[in-house]
Amino acid sequence: MRYPKIGIRPVIDGRWGGVRESLENQTCEMAKIAAKLISENLKYPDGTPVQCVIGCTTIGGGAEAARVAEQFQMENVVATLSVTACWCYGTETFDMDPNTIKAVWGFNGTERPGAVYLAAVMAAHAQRGLPAFSIYGHDVQDAKDTTIPADVLEKILRFARGAVAVGWMTNKAYVNIGAVAMGIAGSFCDPDVLQKYFGIRAEWVDEVEILRRIAIGIYDPEEYEKALQWVKANCREGFDKNLGKDLPEVITKSKIIPAEKDWEFIVKMTLIIRDILFGNSRLDELGWHEEALGHNAVAGGFQGQRQWTDLSLIHISEPTRPEPIS
């Protein structure tokens, strides 16, 4: 998988002749400890540590900023954290990529004005219409202090969490299973909001698709048996509140799944919805190539289409398995 990464930009005073040279080690160390902090404390949804990419050079001017930007584009960097302990050339060094999420950490030190650069570059970001988060410590640190104060640590991690979340969901989908339920406006999925605000697409799958996959067996039978055994061993049923009631025929006829088959249906439905959202390579092996792809979802919703169980599939819990078209 190509993970969304956070790029660390070590920004430095571009004046050679003793100034820049004296700041290289400190600036690079800030970049390293920021990357270490993020990777050791944050994970992607699959449990993998968040990956950081440190710029291939310290950034003292526009030429080096462009080199690092090109590097980051190749690495799928979705957000940048610029770090510095000194004054730097503001608009010559800032991240001007409109597609990255940005933050700047200015070191609050005893010797050089990290705060001055931070204030200047934040003004530049605002002027150019490129929003950035400002990170600055409350307490003054010694120039050689390589620890990250608690307030700075929290700000960096908050920024990184949000940035990774945006990167993870970008160009994925919110999958609506069903449609608007009984005219309830709150269950309507607004595709414009998802696209323009969250950067994800909206997709719809009719709930009949769940019944279709159950009826003809479009799921992994081995995974189903394993899941069903787990459910029987670990899930306890509550009492039946309708037991003994004289229910109207319209209700009893709607119960097309026998009570003793409820768990089988639920397990199949759960696996199928998972496959719809995220895909399943096992289905490809079984010959169900389109279904194996899934919908590249980051999330999904069961919209509660009321009529979906009106389709009475008599043998729904005992699927036949026709040979798929190869």
Residue ranges and their predicted role:
Residues T84, G304, T320:
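Glycine-rich, N-terminal phosphate-binding loop of Rossmann-like dinucleotide-binding domains
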Residues G294-T309, I314-S317:
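Structured mid-domain segments that build the active-site/substrate or prosthetic-cofactor binding neighborhood
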Residues I314-S326:
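Single conserved hydrophobic/aromatic residue that forms the stacking wall/gate
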Residues G90, D310, I325:
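Glycine/Thr-rich phosphate-binding loops of Rossmann-like dinucleotide-binding domains
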Residues M1-R128, Y136-N176, V180-V298:
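Metallocofactor- and cofactor-centric catalytic cores in central/energy metabolism, strongly enriched
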